[in-house]
Amino acid sequence: MATHKPLGFKLRLASAGKSNRNPPAWVMVKTDRKVTYNTKRRNWRRVKLKLG
């Protein structure tokens, strides 16, 4: 991937990176452990982003 990226592309990459994590601990406490994992979790090797 090129070092120089357009701003919109960079923002989309940052957004994808932020959304690719487990829910915080306080969410589990608040929902009485009904929400324990993120169903939209993405692995960089298996699933590619449709950004191009």
From Swiss-Prot:
Keyword Ribosomal protein: yes
HAMAP family for this protein: Ribosomal_eL39
Gene Ontology annotations for the cellular component aspect, listed alphabetically: cytosolic large ribosomal subunit
Keywords assigned by UniProt, alphabetized: Ribonucleoprotein, Ribosomal protein
Family assignment from sequence similarity: Belongs to the eukaryotic ribosomal protein eL39 family.
This protein's name: Large ribosomal subunit protein eL39
Keyword Ribonucleoprotein attributed: yes
Lineage: Archaea, Thermoproteota, Thermoprotei, Thermoproteales, Thermoproteaceae
UniProt GO MF annotations: structural constituent of ribosome
Native organism: Caldivirga maquilingensis (strain ATCC 700844 / DSM 13496 / JCM 10307 / IC-167)
